[in-house]
């Protein structure tokens, strides 16, 4: 009895001792951006510390989730990012600069040593990682960040989950305030095109298809001098993958005009590509706008009525009969489809489709005689030899994507200059007449940006349901929060439960979707971490 009383008294004494805790709070923000497999540093966590009393950050303890494939992780690092400028106080930033550039040629794969000091690195980690810091703190805001590097060969569908278990300041556990959501899954990606690749300043405007052989073909603008639109030195580039997007072959140029007609390359730009696979023949078509001359001014304003290449943009095709390996000389179809009164005719960038009856369809857009843009479609009934256009679907719309939602029924999903949400229209006669879809201008938020839409039939996916799959920046202002959404009712509703945020960061916003196999959707898009980023997502990660 006496022993029990002594033990109880000791327990009460220990409980009365205050927990030793650091005076300063550390704010933690976990990222939701692609983890590029080829990148040496991917930002996993940002740490913001207002050092009012603390002198030293001793260490950070990180826990990796139980389902993480540890054998795929090369290393985890702790970096110190310095201090905050006084004029930035109150902005609650988590970094003074971009530690890893997405736009500076040659500097997109690793942390810029000018902006960070590496304090610790743990290779081949276990489930718990201790990152030693021993970093002297300066009065005011101090920044730290945690980097993740994956091994080559990491699966594109792998995911990493992690949380900060503890951070020690001056030998005491710090109070952590996590400002990001719980349960974030970090998804893998591949930077198909980085700034500076092949001596090009920028890569923009993705299109993506899967051939009958399972080959992925990604097209895009190769913008050599800057990221600006035509007219400029721009070619249409293509990257080809035969392993589901893990690796990509050397870039090809399906369309490039060089110094055609005695004008410099900067006045022979061709771009904003759209690509389709003729599923009946496996022929592949790329369509793009070619601008000849125009004095390096923006083609949107410099293309004029008429048909002559010196005054109006030309609509050109390239064809591949060998699964995207080689490409034909340019085929000019301007005379077939352009009204001479229009200022500018071009495709809807991204992709086209083959209908169930074999008709080839590309989305289009044109600036009419009153200088108002309008979205529509063009189609071919003879395998791409001849093309026709009828009427626009909705006025004051531009970049669109088309999907066959029922046999012979096409849905056109359009960028609308009015802003706020996507415009959607239906045609049953290849664009001769259009009706507004019930979801138009209310179901899909947009900030006036290109988007992607594909239809996947029940027999072609693991869910066994007819799917409409959509991607865009899920916001009405700015371009960020790139998201994949799935509709199970033909696009009438897009449930939040069937959406997956891929990239919260600011980016150019364009994307294109294509099925990799029955279980997996692929997306090529302009992300916050690389100009052309590819990710693979299991359908069951979206429809659970």
Curated annotation (Swiss-Prot):
BNR repeats lie at residues 239-250, 318-329, 378-389, 425-436, 485-496. The keyword Signal applies. Its main location: periplasm. Substrate binds at residues 415, 479. One of its GO terms (cellular component) is intracellular membrane-bounded organelle. The keyword Repeat applies. GO terms for biological process: ganglioside catabolic process; oligosaccharide catabolic process. Gene3D superfamilies: 2.120.10.10, 2.60.40.1290. Its EC number is 3.2.1.18. Keywords: Glycosidase, Hydrolase, Periplasm, Repeat, Signal. The active site is at residue 399. Residues 1-22 form the signal peptide. It is an enzyme of class 3 (hydrolase). GO terms for molecular function: exo-alpha-sialidase activity. SUPFAM superfamilies: Sialidases. It holds the Pfam family BNR_assoc_N. It catalyses: Hydrolysis of alpha-(2->3)-, alpha-(2->6)-, alpha-(2->8)- glycosidic linkages of terminal sialic acid residues in oligosaccharides, glycoproteins, glycolipids, colominic acid and synthetic substrates. It is found in: Periplasm. Belongs to the glycosyl hydrolase 33 family. Sialidases have been suggested to be pathogenic factors in microbial infections. This is Sialidase. It comes from Bacteroides fragilis (strain YCH46). The lineage of its organism: Bacteria, Pseudomonadati, Bacteroidota, Bacteroidia, Bacteroidales. The gene is nanH.
